A protein has these predicted regions:
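Acidic/polar surface patches and capping/hinge elements
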Residues: 135-137, 154, 158-188
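Proteostasis/folding factors centered on peptidyl-prolyl cis-trans isomerases
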Residues: 125-159, 203-227
Length: 227
């Protein structure tokens, strides 16, 4: 089953940091990621397609529930499909930049192979819907998953002989993710929260998040709203 098996490990490797992305976003944009502008209109259209497709895949909700029961972090936010979709779109773009900067790429053949190994496109579609995106992003999602797996393999996360070596490798990849976010000048519209690099998720939506001091770092490295 296609999942993001290294997300929790990378979040742990980033513990203690409080790097967030939230700044002045141009009118009409949900997020700016380098030269990519995710408009609010595009985000709403994406969520609309997702909501129409979801009932056709009963297994999608089951996949999300099983992942949560197993203690895995699933970025799907039932209270805000827009935040779920925006997170996925931003996350894929950041990983693309990590791969580009490190010379790691994924071919169409690799994507096809993973789809075949995981039960075909219908299974992948259900997994993608469980993550909050419509099926038109299925191949992009698989490509992103394979890309991060290639990076983990390259830096020894999956081949480490001991926990210390694995942690060091994770921290190296986590640092690459942070630097990619900085290079891209990742900027999220405050109405959707701020991007929390420690947890690799969108942080809370703060009523006054547009103010520089409204997102406050917590002792765990995340971000909370001021009272």
């Amino acid at each position: 089953m296609i999942r993001k098996p290294f997300k929790i490990m990378i979040a742990a490797a980033l513990a203690g940091t409080a790097l967030t992305a939230c700044g002045p976003v141009k009118t009409g944009a949900a997020a700016l990621v380098g030269n990519d502008r995710i408009t609010i209109a595009k985000l709403n259209s994406t969520v609309d397609k997702w909501s129409k497709e979801l009932p056709k895949y009963p297994g999608a909700q089951q996949i999300a529930q099983q992942a949560q029961a197993q203690g895995q972090q699933v970025p799907f936010d039932p209270s805000s499909p827009q935040r779920s979709a925006l997170y996925q779109l931003v996350d894929m773009l950041v990983w693309d930049e990590v791969g580009r900067a490190d010379g790691v790429s994924v071919s169409g053949g690799q994507v096809d192979a993973i789809i075949a190994q995981n039960g075909g496109l219908s299974t992948i579609d259900a997994n993608v819907l469980a993550q909050g995106l419509p099926t038109e992003y299925s191949r992009d999602y698989v490509k992103s998953v394979v890309l991060r797996q290639e990076l983990m393999r390259k830096y020894g996360v999956t081949t480490a002989q001991d926990q210390q070596s694995q942690q060091q490798a994770l921290q190296q990849v986590a640092g690459m993710y942070q630097r990619a976010g900085r290079r891209l000048k990742l900027d999220v519209n405050p109405r959707y929260g701020s991007f929390d690099f420690q947890h690799m998720a969108l942080g809370p939506v703060c009523p006054t998040l547009s103010k520089p001091d409204s997102g406050t770092p917590t002792t765990s490295g995340g971000v909370s709203c001021q009272a």
